[in-house]
Every structure is written in C-alpha cells, then in structure tokens.
C-alpha cells in the first residue's frame, strides 16, 4: 500500500543522506591530514625564484628606504664629511627632482664657501651648534616694492642691486634655513654639527666652491678676468688660494698670528664681495 511505499522511500533517502555525509567526512579528514606537508629544499629554492621574478619586485624596490651613509662620502677630510644621493643614483628621487644630503662638521671646523647653480636647499639642524653666513644682494627682499619715480631713483636702485650683503645666523638643533640658488654660504661648527638637506631643482645642479684647493671655481678664472674682477692683482688672489690647503672642510680655529688672519679675512671678504 501507500504507507509501505513511503516507508521504503524514506529509508532509501536516509541511506543516501548517510552515505553522502560519510563521503564528506572522509574528504575533510583527508584535507586536515594534508594541512602540514613536508617540502624539500629544492622545492623551497624553486618557490624563492618564482617570488623574486614577480612583477611586484620593481614596484617594491622603488619604495624601499635608503641610507645616506651607506656609500662613501662625496667630500671628506679630518674636519667633516658630506654624503649625498641624487636622482641619478636613486630612481625614487627622479620624479620629485630633488636630492638629499647629510653633512657632518667637526667642532671648530668650517664648511667652506660654496653655492648651488640651480638647486634651492632646505636645511635642518639635527644635532650640534654653529652659525652660517650667506651672501646675497642687498635689500633683495624689497626689490620691486618701490615705485620708480625718476631716473635718479632708478639709478640708485640699480646701484643697490649690484651691492651684496652678508646674512648671519646662529644654528641650534631643530632650526631650519633655506639656501637660495646662486647664493654663497659657509657654515661653522661650534660643536659637532649634523645637517640634513633637501635640494629642489636637483637636475643638472652644480655645487661650486669659492675656497679650498680642489673644485675651486675662482682658481679656474683667467688671469685677465681676475685683474678686472677682484681688488688687487690676480697674483694676490692666486696667493690666497694657494695658502688654502684644505678642500671642502677646513679648520676654523685661529692658529696663526692675528695680522696674518686679518689679511686672509680681508681678502676673503673681497672675493665674496665680487659676486
């Protein structure tokens, strides 16, 4: 009858359900057994090769941090060290068009006068104390504010533009200062001084030193130009340059007679005043 048929169908359904549940349990047990597997050394090496060849490698390498002091300093002697990474050396800096540098100046030492041809450098004092001196046009922050009423006023302003002025400031940890392009600057350390700099417009920038035995742009000037440019003769300028045996960093401690120091100081001011 119908009741007997329903009973048989129900039993068959229960058997089928029980069979499926058994198969599922067996698969689950098999998967659990294979959670921890033993991998050979050769398999590990193959996996490592595949990981290194991933397309993500180029992306991650561009975002990796770098250490400024991991390479040799560009300028170095017993008085200081200068480290720098430029866009040519690090692709991370190419799109930003900046360079990053780090300067260590020993106590009582001087980072010799120099200027950047294109770059504007933002410098922060990490550690130590000292002072810096920057040479720029007199009243250049007020240029363009005065109206040109007559020819005499125009001539006076033109003469002012051709004059230079020295700007000085003390340096302490946490201070930030800006070095405009084309402005000579020198830094003296009253204690061990560490500076971190960021240069904007880094592409094709050149750092030109105005003092020191090496990379001194003044020593490359022809004799006839020196005679016309600097007070005194070209021989006096050459004699001053020859007396500077250090390059990039020098000892700022007075070790010579006061008259001799004053003579060098006056000549240095004359040279800076010509720019």
UniProtKB/Swiss-Prot annotation:
Q: Where is the composition biased (Low complexity)?
A: 50-63
Gene3D superfamilies the record matches? Jelly Rolls (2.60.120.10)
All copies of domain Cupin type-1, residue ranges:
66-238
Chief subcellular location: other
Region spans: Disordered: 1-71, 134-164
Keyword field: Seed storage protein, Storage protein, Vacuole
Bias category Basic and acidic residues: which stretches? 1-17
Name of the protein in its database record: Provicilin
